[in-house]
């Protein structure tokens, strides 16, 4: 496995390619674009992503832990597939923050998102089924077509949510 620690990656673009066997620790990604990319047997720990775009990724054996995303467009990411079951059960998340991100059609199935702040995110078409969302904030979010089946949404933080036609299951 090739390792990168504390490196900066800027404006890297990959479409329809495969990234395999890479370890990224405390790396910074700025302005990077991944479209229809297969990411296999990679690990991202403590990385920061700024102004990046990821569309329709395919993950196989990928682990992500405690990463930060700022002003990113992350479409079709299955966040629940980026952690092993043991870490999920312990309440770990692949991300620490999703600041001002577009998260259209993302999957957050079964994640412990208690108290997480999604404020101002575009969550159109996202799936939050089976999550712990107690005290999570969805203030000023776009929620059109978002699914919240089998969740505890109390107390709901949906103040100012836009296009709030969403499904509670």
Q: Predicted segment positions?
A:
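Tandem repeat scaffolds
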Residues: 1-169
């Amino acid at each position: 496995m090739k390792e990168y620690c504390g490196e900066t990656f800027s404006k890297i673009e990959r479409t329809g390619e495969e990234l395999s066997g890479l370890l990224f620790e405390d790396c910074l990604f700025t302005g990077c674009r991944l479209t229809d990319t297969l990411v296999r047997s990679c690990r991202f720990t403590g990385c920061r992503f700024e102004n990046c775009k990821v569309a329709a990724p395919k993950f196989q054996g990928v682990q992500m832990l405690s990463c930060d995303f700022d002003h990113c467009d992350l479409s079709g990411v299955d966040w629940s597939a980026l952690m092993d079951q043991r870490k999920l059960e312990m309440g770990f998340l692949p991300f620490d923050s999703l600041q001002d991100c577009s998260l259209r059609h993302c999957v957050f199935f079964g994640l412990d998102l208690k108290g997480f702040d999604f404020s101002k995110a575009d969550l159109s078409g996202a799936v939050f089924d089976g999550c712990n969302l107690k005290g999570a904030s969805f203030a000023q979010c776009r929620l059109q077509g978002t699914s919240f089946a089998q969740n505890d949404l109390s107390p709901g933080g949906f103040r100012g949510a836009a296009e709030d036609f969403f499904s509670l299951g």
